[in-house]
Amino acid sequence: MLEFPKLEIPIQKITTGDVEIFLKREDLIHPDISGNKYWKLYFNVNNYLEGPGKNPLVITFGGAFSNHIASVAAFGRIFNIPTMGIIRGEELEDHFFENYTLKRAFENGMRFRFVNRADYREKELLMAELQKEFPEALIIPEGGSNLQAVEGVKFMLTEQTKDFDYLCTAVGTGGSIAGISRYAVEKQNVIGFTVVKDSGLKQKITELNGNSNFNLVDADFGGYGKISDDVVRFINNFWQEYNIPLDPVYTGKMMMKLFQIKEEGYFPKGSKVMAFHTGGLQGIEGANQLLKNKNRNTIDIRL
């Protein structure tokens, strides 16, 4: 069972002045299942483990650099439960060992099925077929975003977080912002920094949390998983100034956009803004691999 962490998650002040920005270090929650991934899995896997059948199996979905895939694989290794990843992109099948995230997931015991992008988009059909093939399996959607994940995310909110005017998180599949906006206190403004181009994202989040008490800000900076030189530069400068590592797909882009809108006057003077560091630092290795192959500057963080 995933235990409730004994660690009190630190909240670090990043900037002062007319608008104060803080970062809640959810990335420190677990060395392998970090950040929001821990809380998204918390109820999903614990409820499943209360009564698994004779053939327990956890199946989930993701792309080549998915933090969720990495976390589920680590969970399987820790609890000795088989895991399977349904991976977007059949072209990866013959050389997935060249991809840091998938290589690490495989070494943690996860087995893969690679599907083409057209079939991958039909996830509801895929999930139904998998449930028929593996009737005792726990099947978790892409990014871990379902109603049990939303319930788990409530633990990211504590007595400490109630004093902030704004709560900010990166948004991929929408589970984290659904939980944060659902369980935030009434006075708080919730902002999601979207790192994907998805016109249906707001509707998906609303379906998960039951309301639309949040705002979305575009922070994809060229597209999901696309890493510009500006993003690399920001992450390196942030590391030098605050000694806090950021990943290039989620939290790095969120913090870069957060700093931008702060300078543009988005927040009223006197605002207290808290952003959630949702982990994903395993992605730095794979990102640097791609950047090196293109002879570009890399993320200079040694964890």
Q: For each predicted feature, which ranges?
A:
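PLP-dependent amino-acid enzyme catalytic core
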Residues: 1-303
